[in-house]
Amino acid sequence: MAEKQNYRIGVISDTHDRWKPRVAELFRDVDEIWHLGDVCHEPVLDELRAITSKLTVVLGNNDFELTYPPSLDLERCGERFHLVHILPRRMPPTDWLLFGHTHRPADEMHGGVHLFNPGSAGLANKGAPLSVGFLTRENGKKFRAKVILLER
């Protein structure tokens, strides 16, 4: 993929067959969307494809009827991304490890790898608010992560 000076990726996880209409509004100007699993049924992905045809999906532990890979390694603008639903025991060689499953947002560094979880967009868990994430590259700089709460 050619390097772009500005690039924006919408990151979503754990929709569990539902998500807030606000997600479509937040994601309307993204270059692509990454879903980190627990979609549960294909119609959710059809709604995301209506926002952008550039949709990447990995399987979650509740995606029994779907046929997507359990993990993916991608490169965008010179940075490496590993997408998976459940955080692996061993860190793969990557710059970013994106995961879901916990339904709780996370944004931290571990051993030189940026760990990012956008939280859950569809099913709240133990008081964590519904949320989505963004990876944004501006003016050719490295990607930065941000979590957006869908409700307060």
Labelled PLM ranges:
Residues 54-92:
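Helix-adjacent hinge/juxtasegments
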